[in-house]
Amino acid sequence: MVDEQVAVEHGTVSHTISREEDGVVHERRVLASGERVEVFYKAPAPRPREGRASTFHDFTVPAAAAVPGPEPEPEPHPPMPIHANGGGETKTNTQDQNQNQTTRTRTNAKAEERTAEMDDTMASSGGQRGAPISADLLSLSSLTGRMAAMAPSWMKSEVCGERMRFKEDVYDGEAETLAEPPRCFMLSFVFIYYCCYLAFLALLAFGFNPLFLPSFMPVGAKVLRGKGRDFGVPLSYGCPTNPFCKVYTLIPAVVINNVTYYPNNTDSHGGHGGFEAAALHVAALFESGCPNLQAVTNRNRTFNVTRASGRVERRLVQDMQRVLASAVVVMHHHCHYETYYVFDGVGPEFGTIPTPCFKDVLAFRPSLVTNCTAPLKTSVKGPNWSGAAGGMKRKQCRVDRLTDRSFPAYLEEVMYVMVQ
């Protein structure tokens, strides 16, 4: 079967003959120059699309793409042969050619009139010359249709105004819009990530750094109570070499009758105990204004305690009074004096020990005589000497670093208080 088509394109007449038996297409074209050409080719057999993409049409033109203008008039049909006298004579070939030429002339004139009307409409509406015509829009719509046809089967697109949104493919034929994640969620995720990163770096720098691990385990010194409850004992006396460790204040030793009583509750003759009694004896002599109290500093300076006149000497006497009174308070309540210095300045969760003076500690022994030449009484008893936590643990006191008299000389302190 042979189909013959006649098309008019821009003044060019093309005769197309296609055969369904072998699919060969024979075209006779008349170029604008008047030259006649013949083209033979085999049209490819169309294949149906597969999947959900088959629902898209390649040449779908949206409603917004329609160009306003007059409706094109239908092309005239080719003239039918006129039979005269019941099928006798017909018109000659010359008459047929003249009629075809007249038809082509009329068609070309109508096409030129439609083009002129479209140009006038665009000019009157303020549009620009050379705007895309309907053929260009048809080509754009066909490109969009082809792109949509190549989309995966689980995704389909829908044009809504000037925006294209993608929808999920569901089995019931309906689609749900994919919601984009909010930007606040993304910003919060980045913020949390960097916070965790900085916390991890701080943990590595401080938490797992061996230089910041103290060599002692603090035991909280509870607040003093009226019933004389015992304090705890520190488990260690070492101090790591880092700037966060508080240097112990030097507690002066007491020399009475050529016997030195050290703050670790030992003496120069190898005995144990007696530092609390020696400190109380110095407090009684100081409050009585006895002139037989001499102080020796770590810079080999010697001066009279009760007659200190210089600014540095008065500061040394005040520091000596504070540390001796604090040591007496701690020892009187059966607690090592190191506890006071470890927790001095720490928060209230560990409790605080009030800074006493000589008048406060003299209340522990109201029977002390005020004679400047009175002998030392070492039999000092405090409340609750017996019990699980009662008494001093001499083995731990011997390892105290405060027994070292080589205190650094960057700050002058009193090392010995001598009773002459």
From Swiss-Prot:
Residues 206-420 are virion surface. GO terms for cellular component: membrane; viral envelope; virion membrane. The chain crosses the membrane at residues 185-205. Glycans are attached at N258, N264, N300, N304, N371, N384. It is a single-pass type II membrane protein. Residues 1-21, 64-129 are annotated as: Disordered. Residues 1-184 are intravirion. It is found in: Virion membrane. Keywords: Glycoprotein, Late protein, Membrane, Signal-anchor, Transmembrane, Transmembrane helix, Viral envelope protein, Virion. Residues 90-108 have a biased composition (Low complexity). The keyword Disulfide bond does not apply. Interacts with BMRF2. Rearranges cellular actin to increase intercellular contacts and thereby promote virus cell-to-cell spreading. Induce the outgrowth of long, branched plasma membrane fronds to create intercellular network for virion traffic. The fronds are actin based and RhoA-dependent. Plasma membrane remodeling is mediated by the cytoplasmic tail. Belongs to the herpesviridae BDLF2 family. This is Protein BDLF2.
